[in-house]
Amino acid sequence: MSIDIKFTINDILFNQESLQKKNKYTCPICFEFIYKKQIYQCKSGHHACKECWEKSLETKKECMTCKSVVNSYNDLSRCLMVERAFDKKECCCIYSFNEQIVEGGTNCSPPDGASDQNQRKLIKDEENGCKEKIEVDQIDSHLINCQYKFVTCSFKGCEKILRMNSLESHQNECGFKLVTCDFCKRDDIKKKELETHYKTCPMVPIDCSQGCSVKIERKSIIDHIENDCCNTQIPCKYFEQGCKVEMKRSELQNHLERVNHQNYMGILIEKLTNQVGQSKKTHDELLKKIEDLSLLVIKFSDACLKKQVLPKALDICSNGYRNKWIISNYSSVAKSKLNCQALSSPMLSILSHLFQVCVYPKGDENKEYISLYLRVNNIEEPNSLKVEYSFTLVNVLDKSKSITKKEDKKVFISSEGWGWGKFLLSDLINKENGWLSNDDKLIIEIYIKILNEEYEPLES
């Protein structure tokens, strides 16, 4: 972020005294240089800045120098030659200075918000400041691109103020720069804290504290000492069986070869044999428990299934079965069917009976109509089934135009189908009439109720 130095043209203009003596490039009223000012003159050639003319003409309609009549700006003319001549005067860059806050007065104007006792002082920086000489009209463009302007470091926490041309080298070494640990790959570590981080980083390789000459990641050092380090003091592997010798891990093999452990091995084998026997017994007991639990799960599942299925079955007995059959891509499917060829719905399992709905897009016998039938597939003669059923052809544009046909009581024998051969003219079934949805689906609502058996009264 760049830091602007507040300045006046007096701070940077060359040959100020000479220019002021000529009285050509200063306003004779406010005595300021005409930097970024518009200069106007009366008919007699007396000039002043626009701001001074405005204040004067508010009270007096006359020239401030010769007292000639000036009614408005229309009586004045712009002094462009003077303005342009001043624009070509040379000055230095404000960034050729260093700015310091000093106590007491100075020949420079205080910045906004600074008191008279706490003012700024510009000190020429011959070594590091900008060396360019520029013309007055180039000041703004030069300051935008000047490589000697003051900037702050962009890294959070760093309050360093430096010149832009040294920013890159500073940021490469800035202690607040975020760097990545080569070991744990954390990428939020300040550069100045990296060495401290290495002292606690769990991934940094460190020397084993037992002098085994192996470097281990800090996080794994305890595991290394307990399980791998050749200098760790460990007991004989037959310690529990009676050999109480302790040695370095690197000496264990030599100890086992040098000392006869046959008696200890016998004790260990006996112990392991007992453990194997106990494990087998525990294994058999667990298998028995698993079998018992499996039986309980089966019984529990059957009970739950009955609780779920029974209410649904009772509802179907009382109110009947309702569902929808949605036939996708009906237009192309219907076109592929020949006369008397049917579309069959998935099987409907209702109270142990299997039903199926059949649609004939081009009719079973009546070629101009769509036909709908209901079939029961698992009735064997001489048995029969009394059924109440209905089909509703849904109009998706206007539900009130949907067509419903109902059979109050039909006796089904074997797998014969019952329904309506002339349900609706086939040519009417399209999207425009509402019988097909926009995605070419035909919707049929199905209602089926199995009627209770009727029994003859008992007589005696």
Curated annotation (Swiss-Prot):
One of its GO terms (cellular component) is cytoplasm. CDD domains: MATH, RING-HC_SIAHs. A zinc finger (RING-type) spans 27-67. InterPro entries: MATH/TRAF_dom (IPR002083), Sina-like_RING (IPR049548), TRAF-like (IPR008974), Znf_RING/FYVE/PHD (IPR013083), Znf_TRAF (IPR001293). It holds the Pfam family Sina_RING. SMART domains: MATH. It is found in: Cytoplasm. This is RING finger protein DG17. It comes from Dictyostelium discoideum. Keywords: Coiled coil, Cytoplasm, Developmental protein, Metal-binding, Repeat, Zinc, Zinc-finger. The keyword Transmembrane helix does not apply. Belongs to the TNF receptor-associated factor family. A subfamily. Residues 320-448 form the MATH domain. The keyword Metal-binding applies. The lineage of its organism: Eukaryota, Amoebozoa, Evosea, Eumycetozoa, Dictyostelia. Induction: By cAMP during aggregation. The expression of DG17 protein is developmentally regulated. A zinc finger (TRAF-type) spans 141-194, 196-253.
